[in-house]
Regions:
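Nuclease catalytic cores that cleave nucleic-acid phosphodiester bonds
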Residues: 84-262
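Domain-level signal for Mg2+-assisted phosphodiester chemistry and nucleotide/NA-binding surfaces
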Residues: 1-106
Length: 263
């Protein structure tokens, strides 16, 4: 029986789902998914899903961090040792707004691609796996794929692109061995079939789906309040950035410039 491990680039997958829900709100429910069950649907004849590794970092936003923790704990509760989270780290970056005199803080995730590479190579070297499912669109992982093929030619590799994401470099490295990447966007029914129950209970422990994921119309209040008529525009441009200073002498000009940038 071929042993399969799944290596999920959590940052890629989360942001792929986040983009997808803008055109189809059903995809917001797929934040609350059983990862072992989801990728069990992709197992081939003669294979068995041994373990799912989810590579992520503790979210810098306290509200998202609580939701993230609930998801990880629910998956662990359902799957025991078949699910494991490998943590990287978010680093703060202070940037200057190009449209105003303000400054803002954003965060950059580090270590995920290195951690994925290290765990895949280690599992191959120790013969802990026969087949790899890699979930990412990060072209930095081209090299470890090539090295595994060179040094461990009997190890199978299948590539999965998160919704709304893809990589030409990764596609080419797969096609070099006459393999095609799998687009998770085309497998909505598998996500539906892999949803966790709204309340996950086991051995006296219960975890509930975060209300924001259950109801797509709930909006979180930001910790730093900016003028309401700018909130949606600012979010389009800066995403999850946290405003630390906001001072612009010509608000109408700022709105006009921001509209042009985000249209």
């Amino acid at each position: 029986m071929n042993r399969v491990n799944v290596y999920i680039d959590g940052f890629n997958l989360y942001h792929g789902l986040r983009k997808m829900k803008k055109s189809d709100t059903d995809w917001q429910r797929f934040y609350w998914v059983d990862f072992v069950k989801l990728f069990d649907h992709f197992i081939l004849f003669g294979q068995t899903l041994q373990k799912v590794y989810y590579f992520s970092a503790p979210d810098h936003d306290p509200f998202r961090a609580v939701r993230q923790d609930a998801l990880f704990r629910a998956n662990k509760l359902m799957n025991d040792d078949r699910f494991e989270v490998i943590y990287g780290k978010y680093y703060r970056k202070k940037l200057k707004c190009k449209l105003c005199t303000g400054r803002y803080v954003t965060h950059e995730e580090k270590r995920t691609d290195v951690n994925i590479c290290a765990y895949m190579m280690s599992d191959c070297a120790l013969n802990n796996v026969d087949a790899i499912m890699l979930v990412t669109a990060d072209s930095d992982l081209v090299t470890p794929i090539e090295l595994i093929r060179r040094d461990y030619p009997n190890k199978q590799i299948r590539l999965f692109f998160p919704p709304t994401t893809e990589s030409r470099d990764l596609t080419n490295v797969m096609k070099a061995k006459k393999k095609e990447p799998i687009y998770l966007l085309n497998h909505k029914q598998k996500f539906i079939n892999s949803l966790l129950p709204d309340v996950v209970s086991k051995d006296g422990t219960s975890l509930t789906i975060p209300q924001k994921w259950k109801d797509p119309y709930i909006i979180s209040t930001p910790s730093n309040v900016i003028p309401n008529n700018l909130m949606s525009l600012y979010a389009k441009h800066f995403g999850d950035a946290q405003i630390i200073e906001f001072d612009h002498p010509n608000m109408q000009s700022f709105i006009k410039n921001l509209n042009q940038l985000t249209s």
